Amino acid sequence: MIVKAKFVKGFIRDVHPYGCRREVLNQIDYCKKAIGFRGPKKVLIVGASSGFGLATRISVAFGGPEAHTIGVSYETGATDRRIGTAGWYNNIFFKEFAKKKGLVAKNFIEDAFSNETKDKVIKYIKDEFGKIDLFVYSLAAPRRKDYKTGNVYTSRIKTILGDFEGPTIDVERDEITLKKVSSASIEEIEETRKVMGGEDWQEWCEELLYEDCFSDKATTIAYSYIGSPRTYKIYREGTIGIAKKDLEDKAKLINEKLNRVIGGRAFVSVNKALVTKASAYIPTFPLYAAILYKVMKEKNIHENCIMQIERMFSEKIYSNEKIQFDDKGRLRMDDLELRKDVQDEVDRIWSNITPENFKELSDYKGYKKEFMNLNGFDLDGVDYSKDLDIELLRKLEP
């Protein structure tokens, strides 16, 4: 079977398993060449299979600390109808490379929102793994089941200050389109907060603390985004922004309790605009990111996920310097993105963008390549003309 990238309504339907393997290896290779850092030895990542979560796992394992890791993610393998999800293979191949290095890489393919999953992870920590030094919450999910009430909540990417129409990029057709987004209802805002806010992160921390699974002075981090005013209406001032504000509010509560009980700390890291499975489908964001990529690459300050996370650990969290937070207690890894010279140039290009010239004025080529890489396509060193053995792939277990 030969696997090619097939688009369905702007999504890439299939994945290339060995392209995913190459992408994991590329990130590992970057970490091996980076300056490195001394950091946590035992790490739990919820949302570990792609984007910032995967980069976090790779960084702590191969970027210096040689950490043992637990990853929680909800993914599917090969079936008669589909070859599986990218995260499924990212988990498999991360584990392969970690084991070669003598590291524990335990995967839980479970619903992170469920109490049963939390119980399984905690039991493993207490029985086999040992107390964790770092807990990273990097979950991006479309739905959440509240196992206490049985209610199922669905997140929506909507505005809250009236309807919105803005340009976005259709990577299937390589063109700019206008995307209309309606204003959210009170119920939709609350459901999005339930799914993408800090409630589940807080529940994880409460359970881990109650069961004595944190080491002394342990750290927990959740990832967020603020971005440019160009994306405010759909992001920071939209349903997602309300959820992220909740995440930041929960960080303060978690931090107070961890600090009091174990001398630990909790905070949100505000990261830069990058192509991830979550961000690629936010209206306006793809065009903004493509322009930003061009500007930051020209200034030699562009970072992809693994570069950003490696810098976060080596220069901010586990450096010899005291961590600098903003006035709301957040770590600002979007510092380079929001530099005045960067944003001024982004604004200049944005004002001149048209459907005819956007490929020339932005780094659309680089943006699309990263988008394709998410599912294992368009990577150097992968033979995409080679038949894949589906039966062999079915035998692979994360």
From Swiss-Prot:
Residues noted as binding NAD(+) in the record, renumbered to the chain: 47-52, 74-75, 111-112, 139-140, 244, 274-276
Pfam families: Eno-Rase_FAD_bd, Eno-Rase_NADH_b, Enoyl_reductase
GO molecular function: enoyl-[acyl-carrier-protein] reductase (NADH) activity; NAD binding; trans-2-enoyl-CoA reductase (NADH) activity
Pathway: Lipid metabolism; fatty acid biosynthesis
Superkingdom: Bacteria
Broad EC category: oxidoreductase
SUPFAM superfamilies: NAD(P)-binding Rossmann-fold domains
Entry annotation: catalytic residues: Y235
Applied relevance: Used in the biosynthesis of medium-chain volatile alcohols as biofuels engineered by microorganisms. The switch from the native flavin-dependent enoyl-CoA reductase used in the production of n-butanol, a key second-generation biofuel, to a flavin-independent trans-enoyl-CoA reductase from C.acetobutylicum leads to an order of magnitude increase in product yield in engineered E.coli.
Effect upon mutating K244A: Loss of reductase activity
Effect seen on changing F11K: Slight decrease of catalytic efficiency and 3-fold increase of the affinity for NADH compared to wild-type
Catalytic reaction(s) noted: a 2,3-saturated acyl-CoA + NAD(+) = a (2E)-enoyl-CoA + NADH + H(+)
Binding site for substrate: Y225
Outcome of mutating Y225A: 12-fold decrease of catalytic efficiency and slight decrease of the affinity for NADH compared to wild-type
Misc. remarks from the entry: Possesses high activity for the reduction reaction, but no activity for the reverse oxidation reaction.
Subunit details: Monomer.
Official protein name in the record: Trans-2-enoyl-CoA reductase [NADH]
